[in-house]
Structures are given as C-alpha cells and as structure tokens.
Amino acid sequence: METSDDTANFQVTLQAGEQKILPKIVNALRQQAVTGIGAAGPTFAGVLFATVSTGDMSGIVIGARTLAPGGWGQYGLFYNAVPYGSASTSSAWLFGLQQTTETRSNVALVNTGETDASTDVFSIDIYSGGTGVKVVTVEGITLGARRWLQINSLLAQHAPGVSQGYAQVKRTSGNNPFIAYAVINDGGQPGERSGDGAFVTSA
C-alpha cells in the first residue's frame, strides 16, 4: 500500500435487498483512484474490514472469493466474513491439516483490532493426527492490530514428517480478538499440481 498506515479506504452503497458483486476488487479500486492502491504491478494480500456509517450490520452478508489461474481455467475458494464480536479471544483449533506430496497446508492469522491498537503475540501447538501427541510449539508470532499474516506450509516448516495433523493457536499476549484459518492446497509445493485450495475455519 502507498499510504503511511498501509491501508486503503473506500465506500460501497447498498440498498435494501440489493446484492452487489465487486469483481477483481484491487483493479476496481485502482480504476476509482483509491488512495494507496497505485499503479498495476505490486501484489496485494491482506484483510478487509467493513463498517457502516450509521446503525449496525444486521442483515448484511459479506463474502470473498480468491482465485488463481490453473489448468484450463481458474481455481478458487469462497469464505464468509467473521462478524464483529465473533472472533477468538484466547485460542482456536485448526483440524485436518495435511502435508504430503500432493497437499500442503497454509495457516493465516488476523488481529482484528477490535479492542485497541495493541500487537497480539501467538504460539501454535502442532499435533500429530496419527498419535495425538504434540510435536512442536511455534512461539513468538507477532501481529499488529488489523493486520494479516500467512504461514506457508506450516507442517513442512515446523513439523517435518507429520503428514496429517491439527494445531491450537493461542494468543499469549495482546488485547485484541483474532481470526485463525487454514487453506489446504493441492500440491505438496507451490507450483505443483493445480494449487486449488479448500478453506478450513477454526473451532
């Protein structure tokens, strides 16, 4: 982002009963000359926060679809927004993680900034799905308020030899609720197989 706080702001007007789809959102914002987007070239990855100027967001559903080219077309996954007040406050579990020659698991975290501007610090306990034994704890993961972080190939990086497992994400310091999720990708390494993803919500 080409702003001091790495944030771009824009408005959407939605009438009662209206559905609105914003395809290729970054390009759309660029065409609107939204401050912070800049010229085509850089890759954008991050988190979207939605608020209303008056009232509340009851009755409003927000979702996103992330797409990537592959094979003869494109692959993608869809996920819904997490409502204010519904994020995790102390820990979250992610089940069904995989790391094989055909699949890999990325894990992502969002510091919602709902409480204040403090940084959250996390640890991740990784368990073997075959034995139920904790294999390793990844500590000292820091994330500023209203920021997003993805850990690619979590099992390959931190628990080599674990082909299927699960993880507990814990907030060890900080005041803000957080969101944890995983994406199971087709292909043991980036660039292999289709790269198609399956979204895994936390429990």
Predicted features by range, described:
Residues 1-203:
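Gly/Pro-rich, tryptophan- and cysteine-flecked surface segments typical
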